[in-house]
């Protein structure tokens, strides 16, 4: 059996954030199980988050092919620095809420000219290079992971040139049904072009892989011929040294980004009311947001005299530093996207939340995929945004347990471990032989 597999990914260390970890961990455990993964990734990517701590998980024997990429962000930055005196970050192309004229223009250009995304210029040179590479190295299996969905078009190009290749298209997010597209002011022509590209990938890939049951059903309804589900997960190695300790304050933490689609205010209003109604809660509680937080939510907190005393913001931390925080946390706040397809939203961090053993209180669709996992694992609750009394009851119950020193250890076992998930991926790849 040929155990060589080429993985084509935009996000790779030192890139940080959740997008990199899925395939970083798969590569780690594929290598441990006798497979030979090759990783193809940009030499000079434009990403918003850097995390060098993730480099420790890259197996030294894995060949990383770093190939030059040109992205319009670089040119756009030069233009914006001339006209506005500051650079525009990649995330500004998809900013929600109040936008400057420059941001509106950038989003319109991004949505209607760079289809499926701004990495489209990497497709042809990558196909030309990799067509020779897979033949020289006798690779017969390739995996593309998106977003960015341009990478699936690299896979499509390779498959068309080498019909014997087995191609897995991994969707960490939807494509034509992705809520992000609704923020980009797409013309009808642009949206239809997304759908045509998506259809070609769904029809030509030997397997469509995705991360939630909701997305699995979506892709089946869109006509994908072989859809498989392998969720995200947690790496047991990351949690071996995490020790829970009694906290001097009742500590509620949210880890990750806050934006217009992920709104923690329902939980914050409940905490505010509890502070006003319960003196002991008001004295003991502290809330910490770790990661990028938009100005609207910061303003909401800072303008409230109660919340301002209890809520702090910490900028982005390396993954190894984030892991340490789990041991000094009492409740983890999970904020799910409120959007058309929110039922399928399972943030990658949910699985690390589960592995931490801390109680989870979530905001979002109470019948969605994330809520189902949390409920099945007995790890907490997910409440609808308008359930003010539900949030108050959940926080008060957790606070009572903290006061009594009876905080339960809710750590899940191996259902979502990266090692077990890699076994599922291997079974999928072996089915091609």
List where the protein language model places each region.
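Membrane-proximal helix-turn-helix segments that form the acceptor-binding/catalytic region
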Residues: 131, 150-153, 157-161, 175, ...
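Carbohydrate-associated surface elements
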Residues: 214, 233
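N-terminal subdomain of nucleotide-sugar transferases
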Residues: 1-73, 207, 216, 227, ...
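Nucleotide-sugar-dependent
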Residues: 262, 318-325, 332-351, 360-372
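Acidic anion/phosphate-binding donor-loop and adjacent secondary structure
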Residues: 72-78, 234-249
């Amino acid at each position: 059996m040929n155990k060589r597999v080429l993985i084509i990914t935009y996000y790779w260390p030192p890139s940080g954030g959740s997008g990199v970890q899925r395939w970083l961990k798969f590569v780690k455990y594929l290598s441990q199980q006798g497979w030979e993964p090759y990783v193809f990734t940009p030499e000079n990517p434009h990403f918003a988050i850097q995390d060098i701590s993730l480099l420790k998980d890259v197996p030294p024997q894995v060949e990383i092919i770093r190939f030059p990429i040109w992205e319009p962000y670089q040119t756009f930055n030069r233009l914006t620095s001339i006209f506005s005196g500051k650079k525009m970050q990649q995330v500004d192309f998809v900013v929600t809420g109040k936008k400057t004229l420059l941001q509106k223009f950038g989003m319109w250009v991004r949505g209607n000219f760079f289809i499926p995304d701004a990495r489209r210029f990497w497709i042809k040179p990558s196909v030309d290079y990799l067509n020779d590479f897979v033949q020289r190295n006798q690779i017969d299996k390739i995996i593309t992971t998106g977003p960015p969905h341009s990478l699936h078009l690299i896979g499509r190009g390779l498959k068309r040139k080498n019909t014997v290749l087995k191609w897995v298209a991994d969707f960490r997010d939807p494509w034509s049904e992705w809520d992000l597209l609704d923020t980009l002011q797409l013309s009808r022509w642009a949206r239809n072009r997304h759908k045509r590209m998506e259809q070609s990938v769904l029809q030509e890939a030997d397997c469509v892989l995705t991360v939630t049951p909701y997305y699995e059903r979506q892709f089946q309804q869109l006509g994908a011929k072989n859809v498989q589900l392998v969720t995200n997960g947690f790496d047991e190695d990351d949690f071996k040294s995490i020790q829970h300790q009694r906290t001097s304050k009742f500590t509620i933490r949210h880890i990750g980004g806050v934006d217009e689609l992920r709104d923690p205010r329902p939980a914050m209003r409940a905490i505010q009311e509890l502070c006003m109604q319960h003196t002991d809660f008001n004295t003991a509680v502290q809330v910490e947001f770790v990661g990028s937080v938009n100005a609207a939510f910061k303003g909401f907190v800072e303008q409230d005299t109660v919340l301002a005393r209890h809520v702090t913001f910490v900028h982005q931390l390396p993954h190894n530093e984030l892991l340490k925080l789990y041991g000094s946390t009492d409740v983890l706040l999970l904020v799910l996207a409120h959007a058309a397809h929110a039922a399928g939203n399972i943030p990658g961090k949910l699985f690390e939340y589960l592995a931490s053993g801390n109680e989870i209180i979530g905001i979002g669709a109470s019948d969605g995929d994330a809520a189902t996992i949390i409920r099945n694992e007995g790890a907490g609750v997910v409440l609808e945004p308008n359930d003010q009394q539900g949030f108050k009851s959940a926080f008060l119950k957790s606070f009572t347990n903290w006061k009594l020193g009876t905080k339960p250890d809710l750590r899940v076992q191996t259902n979502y471990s990266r090692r077990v998930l890699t076994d599922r991926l291997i079974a999928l790849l072996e089915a091609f032989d």
